[in-house]
């Protein structure tokens, strides 16, 4: 019986991080967590990481789609935060989620969902590196594993 599992180390992976500027004080913490995980656990060279900034979470799927279409990356991490009450929460959160999932399916590329969808600012702060861990770091871990799984499945 063959079992395929993803390792965390992916030193040659080419990773694009698409990050929203809206709520940047939260998103920058997510970015720090993702970069730290890619470097320390994934052993990904900073030369293989590209950071692409866009206005907000609603724009993440389009930027991720164009990034995937370029065929220059093995995986994409999408980072952002949508806080209920600050925007049209349901629309932005839903379209962001659906759009990023569609990019992964259309282009056969892992797209890690590191977008916080929370009710309160305090929840976002907790999930960006305090009480509830760092969801940017968690997205990077998922991405590293998926890069290795897809490499095995495709070979």
From Swiss-Prot:
EC number: 2.5.1.78
Organism, scientific name: Photobacterium phosphoreum
Protein name (Swiss-Prot/TrEMBL): 6,7-dimethyl-8-ribityllumazine synthase
Domain of life: Bacteria
Amino acids binding (2S)-2-hydroxy-3-oxobutyl phosphate: 86-87, 127
Assembly and oligomerization: Forms an icosahedral capsid composed of 60 subunits, arranged as a dodecamer of pentamers.
Catalysed reactions listed for this entry: (2S)-2-hydroxy-3-oxobutyl phosphate + 5-amino-6-(D-ribitylamino)uracil = 6,7-dimethyl-8-(1-D-ribityl)lumazine + phosphate + 2 H2O + H(+)
Gene field: ribH
GO cellular component terms, A-Z: cytosol; riboflavin synthase complex
């Amino acid at each position: 019986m063959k079992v395929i599992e993803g390792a965390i180390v992916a030193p040659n992976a080419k990773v694009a991080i698409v990050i929203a500027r809206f709520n940047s004080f939260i998103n920058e913490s997510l970015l720090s967590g993702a970069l730290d995980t890619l470097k320390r656990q994934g052993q990904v060279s900073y030369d293989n990481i590209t950071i692409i900034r866009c206005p907000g979470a609603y724009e993440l799927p389009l930027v991720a789609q164009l990034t995937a279409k370029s065929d220059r990356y093995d995986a994409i991490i999408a980072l952002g935060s949508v806080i209920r009450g600050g925007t049209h929460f349901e629309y932005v959160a839903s379209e962001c989620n659906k759009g990023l999932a569609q990019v992964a399916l259309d282009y056969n590329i892992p797209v890690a969902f590191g977008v916080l969808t929370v009710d309160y600012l305090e929840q976002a702060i907790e999930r960006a590196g305090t009480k509830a861990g760092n969801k940017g770091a968690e997205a990077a871990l998922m991405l590293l594993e998926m890069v290795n799984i897809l490499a095995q499945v495709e070979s």
